[in-house]
Design a protein with these regions (language model features):
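Boundary/entry segment of secreted carbohydrate-active catalytic domains
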Residues: 19-61, 68
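Aromatic- and carboxylate-lined catalytic core of secreted/periplasmic carbohydrate-active enzymes
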Residues: 286-310, 314-318, 333, 337-362
Length: 362
């Protein structure tokens, strides 16, 4: 394909930097801070304290962190009468040393429940166990966290329920009011953290995702009408480089949340390139384009205040698990840094997108 004079081929559009271009004032966190934004990633405590390159990268690039797994029930509750906060505490300690905020993830989800759950929790004791967990965990970190994902992934439009709620252990054991209970209990335990509902598959304008997005909106509207304390909605943003880019539907959703005085966080951003063909450079360019266009669209909305990726380096990504891996077996390039901790084209695309937000100094 012919390229205009002075233009770069598609594969080179975002391949314009080296490691020296990404630290200090050139880091993601520095660019975000100038624009009143938070930028960060999901982290693993063992790697923060056991892998120097990983820790250095996270410390340099992020001004907000979220635990990938360390704050989920399965990690925190080794036994019905025992809590284990070591991993979560380690993340907060790292963040404190590096001037970073922390998001809590999550207080209620239908997955990542401990092995003892099914044989212990019944309709008679579920509400007590549920509220005790939220009070204990949110209370331990009260006034220390930026926000909590209080309820995660509660909507499933294929459930057959008129309210669109996912069929989950919490719905079965407590009933649909479990969501209100979770948010009210979290607010009582921590009056300062921004209480968030978080979900996936609500970004695109397909019929399925449009319906789910409407389900989330109806859930949040109902909560507001009932006086349930909610401050934000998390849009997970597990996107695909081979799918149509999110557009008008998501933009209007974000704006409607803004009219409800709710913030929006991009909470788990990564770009799956398993179906993208071509060279590594071409695949990297396709991923970078999605980062640039998607984040630019999102941060153009004033109530979008944080962008977090689900990991920071391709060395550690869930998208290389067999269920999501490329058919050709090649590793995915889905995050801002490659497997060798070098900045990928996605890094520069993300940084450019953050720069598109009106600066605090303008």
């Amino acid at each position: 394909m012919a390229v205009a004079a002075g233009a770069l081929p598609a594969a080179d559009l975002f391949a314009q930097g080296t490691t020296s271009d990404v630290r200090g004032a050139k880091s993601l966190r520095a660019h975000a801070q100038l624009r009143g934004l938070l930028v960060g990633c999901a982290v693993v405590p063992g790697k923060l304290h056991g892998e120097r390159d990983y820790a250095d990268l996270v410390g340099a690039q992020a001004n907000i962190l979220v635990a990938e797994n360390a704050m989920k029930w399965k990690a925190l509750r080794p036994a019905p009468d025992k809590f284990d906060f070591r991993g979560a505490d380690a993340i907060l300690a790292f963040a404190s040393r590096h001037g970073q905020k922390v998001r809590g993830h999550n207080l209620c989800w239908h997955e990542a429940l401990p092995d003892w759950f099914a044989g212990t929790v019944t309709k008679d004791n579920a509400r007590q166990i549920f509220t005790e967990h939220i009070r204990t965990v949110a209370g331990r970190y009260a006034r220390k966290l930026h926000s909590w994902d209080v309820v995660n992934e509660a909507i499933d439009t294929k459930s057959g329920r008129p309210d669109g709620l996912r069929k989950s252990p919490w719905l079965e054991l407590i009933g649909p009011e479990y969501i209100d209970v979770a948010f009210r209990t979290a607010r009582a335990a921590d009056p300062k953290a921004l209480l968030t509902y978080n979900d996936y598959g609500i970004e695109e304008d397909s019929a399925e995702q449009t319906a789910k997005r409407e389900g989330v909106l109806q859930l949040v509207q109902g909560m507001k009408k009932r006086g349930v304390p909610i401050d934000a909605v998390g849009v997970q943003s597990h996107l695909s480089a081979s799918d149509p880019l999110p557009g008008a539907g998501l933009r209007e959703f974000v704006r409607e949340l803004g009219r409800m005085k709710l913030q929006v966080f991009v909470t788990e951003l990564d770009i799956n390139e398993r179906k993208v063909e071509g060279s590594v450079a071409e695949r990297d360019a396709a991923v970078a384009r999605v980062y640039k266009d998607y984040v630019t669209m999102m941060v153009a909305e004033p109530n979008v205040s944080a962008v977090l990726t689900w990991g920071i380096t391709d060395r550690y990504t869930w998208l290389d698990a067999p269920k999501y891996a490329r058919p050709d077996g090649q590793p995915q390039g889905c995050l801002p840094f490659d497997a060798n901790y070098e900045p990928a084209p996605a890094f520069f695309a993300l940084r450019d997108a953050l720069d598109s937000r009106r600066s605090n100094e303008q």
